[in-house]
Structures are given as structure tokens and as C-alpha cells.
């Protein structure tokens, strides 16, 4: 039985240690499942550009995160969407992305991109539920069969 979550959200940035700890946990999980092949994305996953980060806290403890970075004047990329295992299947990631999308639309961006593992079915289903659809690969992901790129237009 799942306990009650007393959730609050906090808007922050990529330097927040609570966010960085969740990202380290996310990365450990990826490395356990995928192995060293994942290292080809290390440079891409560095925080060398500012990110807008939304944290979910339960009784003050970080339980989930989602972020985005600006790609250009029209678009953003959602990244580092993660929910701790004990809190999954409760709609938390959905809520975090929706909240970030509100910020993106307020700032007049036209669309967003999300990249995920080609076999990450739960993530793909979540993004489809949020209105994302498959799109052409971009940047370093062109020709990379291990990932898929998804896009959502904001009208």
C-alpha cells in the first residue's frame, strides 16, 4: 500500500544539490540497466547550459525532478525527468512536466523536445500521454537507434 505524499514543488536551477543528487541516482540506474554504452551521452548530459528545474518534495525530501534547457528562441528540451522508485506510478512526472510546460508557454516557446531510450516504454507512454509524438532525431542523436526524439507543439 502506498503512503500519503505531502508534495510540494520548488522551482530552482541545475546547481541545486537536491536536483544533482536525484540526477546521480537516475544515472546510476541507467548505468545498471544499460552499462558503459551510456557513457557516450555523458558530455550531452553535463549542465554546461542553464536549466530550469522543478523539484517535487515529500515532507521536505526530494522525490522527483524534471528540467528544461533552451535550445533556441523557439524551442526547449526537457531533460532529467526522474521519480524515485518508491514514488512512481502516482502521476508525479506528469505533473512536473505539465508545470514546466506552463512556464515554457508563458515564455512564448513554440515547441519542446524530449529524448529518451528507444526501449524505455514507460517514459514513451508518459510523453505520448502528455501530447508528444515521435520526431526526427536532432544533434548528436541523428542516426542513434538507441534513443528516440519526441516533440510537442505549443499552440
Segments from the language model and where they lie:
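Acetyl-CoA-dependent GNAT
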Residues: 7-79, 84-85, 97-99, 103, ...
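Short glycine-rich hinge loops at helix-strand junctions in the catalytic core
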Residues: 91, 108, 131
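Conserved catalytic-core motifs of GNAT/GCN5-like acyltransferases
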Residues: 113-116, 124, 128-149
